[in-house]
Structures are given as C-alpha cells and as structure tokens.
Curated annotation (Swiss-Prot):
The active site is at 305 (o-(5'-phospho-dna)-tyrosine intermediate). Releases the supercoiling and torsional tension of DNA, which is introduced during the DNA replication and transcription, by transiently cleaving and rejoining one strand of the DNA duplex. Introduces a single-strand break via transesterification at a target site in duplex DNA. The scissile phosphodiester is attacked by the catalytic tyrosine of the enzyme, resulting in the formation of a DNA-(5'-phosphotyrosyl)-enzyme intermediate and the expulsion of a 3'-OH DNA strand. The free DNA strand then undergoes passage around the unbroken strand, thus removing DNA supercoils. One of its GO terms (biological process) is DNA repair. It comes from Staphylococcus aureus (strain MRSA252). GO terms for cellular component: cytoplasmic replication fork. Residues 2-135 form the Toprim domain. Residues 152-580 form the Topo IA-type catalytic domain. GO terms for molecular function: DNA binding; DNA topoisomerase type I (single strand cut, ATP-independent) activity; magnesium ion binding. The record marks 60, 167, 175, 307 as: Interaction with DNA. Its cofactor is Mg(2+). The gene is topB. Residues 186-191 are annotated as: Interaction with DNA. This is DNA topoisomerase 3. NCBIfam families: PRK07726.1 (NF005829), topB (TIGR01056).
Length: 711
C-alpha cells in the first residue's frame, strides 16, 4: 500500500519526488515503492457557472436575479480535465491507502486539494504537509512531521465559504448592474471597496486648499537654529517683527544637551511590504513582484513562502539562522554577512514571536545558496532586498548622539538639532552610511553673534495619489485612510487585515485596471468615469471597506472553528437579495462618456474607448458582444534614438511604433530591426526563450512583430 501525495503544481511535485527519491516517472505522476506523487495545475475543479445549473441562465436577464442555488455545484475545468482524470484514478486506486495534501500551505491551497477530493468522492484518510519553503531539507523535515488532515477541516470550510460567497455576491451584483444599465459593470465584495478607497483619496486631493506658512531661522557660526514654537505662523509680518527685535542683539547659549539613542531595523518582509518597496525602488508592480517572488520560491528555492502577512519568525527557527546567513555569502552583502556567522542568536530577539505568526512566517532567505548568474535582473533585485532586510534584522542597533543646542535671543528661543552616529550597526549594510562627527562649537553660557536671519515661505501640500505600492498598503490598513463613525470599526479593520488578503490584493488591483475602473497616469492611480459611476450605482454597503472587513473577520472565525460556514453563507444570500432588489428598484442612469463613432465589427454598435494599464482599447458597448480592439499600447521595444519605450498603434502589418521624441517606424521596419539584432534568422527556440523571459514582457510588442517573420 502506498501514500498518494497531491501537490499544487508540477514543479513542486518534482521537488517532492526529488527530496523523497520517488524516481519512477509515469504519465502525470511519479512513483516508488512507498509514495505516489501527482499534481494539480492550480485549480482543477471550480464553481459551476449559472448556465451549468440551468441553460436558460446563459443569457443575462434582470428578471432571473437573484441566482441563488440551493446547493453549490462544482465542475472539472475543461482545459485541465486530463490531469483531473489522472488524479482521480490515483485517488481511487486500491493500492493507495491515504492521501497527503501537499498543496500550498494556506486557505487557497487547501481549497485546491479539497475540491478535487470532494469531486472524486474520496473516503481515504488525509494527512497534511505544512511547510514554508520547498527546499530538499524543508520537504524532508515536513514529511517527518505530517499532520492529521482533519486539523485543517476548518481552514477548508473557511476557504469554501469565501469561494461560494464571492460567487453569490459577485455573479448577482455584476449581472444586476450590467443588465439594469446595459453596460459592462462589475461589483465584488473586495474590488468595489478598493475603488472607493481610491476615490476617497482623489476627493481629498481635489478638495484640498493649500495654505502658506512661514518659518524663521538664525545662522550662528555656520549652524542654522530654528525658532521654537508650538504654532504655525501664517502671518509673515509676525516673524518680520521678531527679526526687527533681534537686530544688534547678541544671543546666549542656554543649554547643550546630548542624549544617546538607538534606532532599530525595520521588520522582516511580509508580502505587502515587499511589494510596496519593490514599487518604491524600481516601479515594479505588485503582480509582477509576486510572480518574481514565486519563481524565487519554487524554481530557485532561495526564499521562503511568499503569501505571508507576518513580519516575524517562530522561535524554533533560531538554530537555522547560520545556514541562511551562509547562503547569502553569494551576494554583494557577503562582507556584512560574514561577521554574523560568529554571532549567537536568541529566541528573545524581537524578530522571533510565535504569537505573531499564523500560517507562515516572514519572507527570508532559505539555506540554499543561489547561483547568482541564474537569476534574472528582476529576481536579483528582489532577492537582494530580502537579503538586505534579513541581515539588517540580525545586526546590532544603530546608535547615535542626539544633540540639542538651545539659543535665547531677545526673549525668543531657537533650537539646533543634530544627530551624530556613534555605532553604524545595521546601517552598515547600506552604501553611503558612515560614522559622523559634529564639531559643534557651542558651550552652555556662550555669548554668540547672529550672522544672518532667514524667513522661509512654505505651502501645505495635499495627500499624494495612490500608486500601486501605496494602494496595497492602504488596502491592508484602510482605517488610516477613511473616516469611520465608530472607533471600534477601525479596530475591526486592523484586526482583519483590511480589504482582501496578501494573496489576493495584487490581483484585485490588476482586475480594476483591466475593467477600466481605475487608471494610472504617471504612476498616480485615479478613478475613471466608469469607476465613479460604479460607486454611484452600487449599493452603499458594497462600497464600504468595513463590510468586507467584517466578512473577513467571520471567515477567520470559521477558520478557527468559532463560526458556522453555513450561517455565513446564509447571511451572504440575504445580503445578495437586498443588493439585487436595490439595483432593480434604482432610478439612476449610466452614461458612457467615452463613446466613439467606431462601429463594432461584430454587432455594429458604437464602441467605447477605454484606457488600460499599458495603453488604450476599443470595447463594444454591448456587454454580451465582448468584442475588443487595441488602439494603442506601450511596449517593451525601445526607441533607437532616445531609448524610451515605444507605443504600438494598430496591429499586424499595418502596425506603427511611435515614440514621444517623434521617432516612428512601421511593422516591417521593426521586423527588419529584430532580424538584424538577431544576426539574420531567429530560431523558434531562441524566440520562445526570449518571449518567456521573466522580465515583465506580458505586453511584448514582438509577439505581433515576430509572428510575421519567416521562422
């Protein structure tokens, strides 16, 4: 009898097979005399569509809503049905005694496996592999500590409840809004509050009125002292009067105080923090960061599990620090890492906290030493950031003297503040940081002359527009960005982790871009006209971050066995009925403000011009038509003159590439450029390798250009 191991992806199945020496390769699985390891391809089973309940529901009609099945059905996904049949046969095989679930250790990973097992009708015992990295050592250790699968039943119930609730709310709200207003409109329990978050920030900026204020400083022996005051001066004349009082008056040093202080490194990375920093440093979006991180985790095995919301490690990891540090010696941080090899680490360090780790600990390097030449440019940047943060967390604090010099002149107090570094500590890892010395020439009681006075004019600034990084953080902590009637609501939002989860937020932002509810202009995210109208037409409850946080709180309670999934689903059904009735009875109107005179080639109706993340697109106004045409999109092809990215207009042989500098070239010229760059003929293998580069080439212009080449 054998144990069947079910992994989430083929790559993880191969890693498990390698770690456990399961060497016999079969069609869709690996096998030895103890184990069989097979895989899903992400989800193999999903929720049925409305028309799979009733073929009459294929056509969207307002009168058919709400669609609330008595029992939710699941179906096998067509394009991966072959692998499902393989997995099913193995589950039902008489030589298989039990199932080891080895999908991702989290809510969604549990759902992937359980939907398959339920669809097959499995009755065999379950065990669970729960690991945070897929290195050989981690897998082998995990198999020595397999858990009883029943321990994760509540996790599955929470995952299933989330999936079914999203289906019930999303299908009905989207169909109701679309059929009511004859427009492609979409609602969801996470996406709609996110639009509201962006809209609230946009309104704050639009309503902001700048105010002028003034500050006064004195220069003494080359050092600038600032006027100490509890108020902001909006009247320049007040400061000018103070300056007049200071003329021909000497000052006196009232005190020179030195206080020794320490600063500590930032927390280890969770996914949201890492995505935010990648955008801040390199303008790499959250989705691209997650994909790159997944590659570092699965393919290279040099970092731990990506989809974590924790900034801490568990105390049982203390003894693994040295081997992880050893792995980082392959990086440019080897000189900073080397002294840490002789340091003793304790579970009392602030980075170790069992109470602040739920499913997975913070993202840190594994014990696998990377082959740096194997990493892409983006993978290298991301890995370096993780290593930098990890090493900083293990280093000593940064120490400095905070010096405050207080000056009195004509009854007014001025202050000079300087920080003098005494111990670099963790800041030694960053270039440009060094020990500083301040030869401040002041002593208490000194009489000093004022060499210059300076009144500076300032202006208050509005809050910044969200970018892809800061929007993620706002989704995690929406209570910091919206006004709430009751403080307990802020606590609810904080406890539940805000809108969405670390695993879903990047996808939500991406979806909002694709549905033209939000747009990015020069890195500033704004709500489109369509997004604003969605907020106006949607039921108010569905636009509130608080509501989705309360739902998430209940899902967490289900996960902990403290709330019934059935109760939650019934609440979602009642909520959906109210939403649909509200939309049906609404007398509001939807207006296309981007309607063009271009006729749809499929149905003849006028098309709508929409902005996408990378350009513009024409979309048929009829939701049932679904015809789309690219108008323009930014590509990764570079201008031969100024090296900026070219924008593609049109498609096929008629396509034209244009640059902001004025350069323009036809598709034929681009083809020729590609040929000469590749020394003539381009092989299929070379082209496939080029197109698969993990460097954000999702909208690669050469997909169109190269298909016309005679390869």
């Amino acid at each position: 009898m054998k144990s069947l191991i079910l992994a989430e992806k083929p790559s993880v199945a191969r890693d498990i097979a390698d770690a456990l020496q399961i060497n016999q390769k079969r069609n869709g699985y690996f096998e030895n005399n103890q184990y069989i390891v097979t895989w899903a391809l992400g989800h193999l089973v999903t929720n049925a569509t409305p028309e799979q309940y009733d073929k009459n529901l294929k056509e969207w009609r307002l009168e058919d809503l709400p669609i609330i099945p008595k029992y939710m059905k699941t179906v096998v996904i067509g394009k991966t049905s072959k692998q499902f049949k393989t997995v099913k046969a193995l589950i039902l095989d008489n030589k298989v005694k039990d199932i080891i679930i080895a999908t991702d250790a989290g809510r969604e990973g549990e759902l992937v496996a359980r939907l398959i097992l339920d669809k097959v009708g499995n009755k065999k015992p379950l065990r669970r592999l729960w690991i945070s990295s897929v290195t050989k050592k981690a897998i082998q250790q995990g198999f020595k500590n397999l858990k009883d699968g029943r321990q994760y039943n509540d996790l599955y119930y929470a995952a299933l409840a989330r999936s079914e609730a999203d289906w019930i709310v999303g299908i009905n709200a989207t169909r109701a809004l679309t059929t009511k207003y004859d427009a492609q409109l979409s609602l969801g329990r996470v996406q709609t509050p996110t639009i509201q978050l962006v809209n609230t920030r946009q309104q704050e900026i639009n309503q902001f009125k700048p105010q002028q204020y003034y500050t006064l400083s004195l220069t003494v022996k080359g050092f600038d002292f600032q006027l100490e005051s509890n108020q902001r001066y909006t009247n320049k004349e007040t400061l000018e009067q103070i300056v007049n009082n200071l003329k021909n008056v000497d000052g006196k040093i009232k005190s020179v105080a030195t206080k020794h202080k320490k600063s500590y490194p930032q927390s280890l990375y969770n996914l949201t923090d890492l995505q935010q920093d990648m955008y801040r440093r390199y303008k790499i979006g959250p989705k691209e960061t997650l994909n790159t991180l997944q590659s570092l985790y699965e393919r290279h095995k040099v970092v731990t599990y990506p989809r974590t919301d924790s900034n801490y490690l568990t105390t049982d990891m203390v003894d693994t620090m040295k081997e992880r540090i050893q792995a980082t010696m392959a990086t440019t941080y080897k000189d900073q890492a080397r002294p840490l090899m002789s340091k003793t680490f304790s579970s009392k360090m602030s980075i170790f906290n069992n109470q602040k780790v739920s499913d997975h600990h913070a993202i840190i390097p594994t014990e696998v030493r990377p082959v740096m030449s194997d990493l892409s440019n983006r993978e290298l940047k991301l890995y370096d950031m993780i290593v930098e943060r990890f090493l900083e967390a293990l280093m000593s604090p940064h120490e400095y003297d905070a010096i405050t010099v207080t000056l009195e002149v004509a009854g007014h107090t001025f202050v000079l503040k300087e920080n003098v570094t005494t111990v670099l500590g963790f800041k030694s890892i960053r270039q440009g940081e060094s020990i500083t010395e301040m030869q401040q020439p002041f002593s208490e009681g000194d009489e000093v002359k004022i060499s210059k006075t300076n009144i500076r004019e300032h202006e208050t600034t509005p809050p910044e527009y969200f970018n892809e990084g800061s929007l993620l953080k706002a989704m995690e902590n929406p209570q910091n960005f919206i006004q709430l009637k009751d403080k307990k609501y802020a606590q609810t939002l904080k406890q539940t982790g805000g809108i969405g989860t670390v695993a879903t937020r990047a996808d939500i932002i991406d979806k909002l871009f694709n549905m033209n509810a939000i747009e990015s202009r020069d890195g500033k995210i704004k709500v489109t006209s369509k997004g604003k109208q969605i907020l106006e037409l949607a039921p108010e409850e569905l636009t509130s971050p608080l509501l989705t946080a309360q739902w998430e709180e209940k899902l967490l309670l289900i996960e902990r066995g403290k709330y019934q999934a059935k109760t939650f689903i019934n609440e979602m059904k009642d909520f959906t009925k109210d939403v649909v009735n509200g939309i049906k009875n609404s007398d509001r109107k939807y207006k296309h403000d981007n309607l063009t005179t271009t006729e749809c080639p499929t149905c003849g109706k006028f098309m709508i011009k929409v902005k996408t993340k990378n350009g513009q697109m024409l979309v048929c106004q009829d939701p049932s038509c679904k015809t789309k045409k690219n108008v323009q999109r930014k590509t990764n092809a570079r201008c031969p003159n100024c090296k900026k990215k070219l924008t593609l207009f049109g498609k096929g042989k008629e396509a034209v590439y244009r640059c902001v500098c004025g350069h323009s070239e036809t598709q034929a010229h681009m083809d020729q450029r590609m040929k000469s760059k590749s020394s003539g003929k381009v092989s299929r293998k070379e082209m496939k390798k080029y197109m698969n580069k993990n460097e954000g080439l999702d909208n690669n212009p050469f997909k169109d250009a190269l298909k016309n080449l005679n390869l």
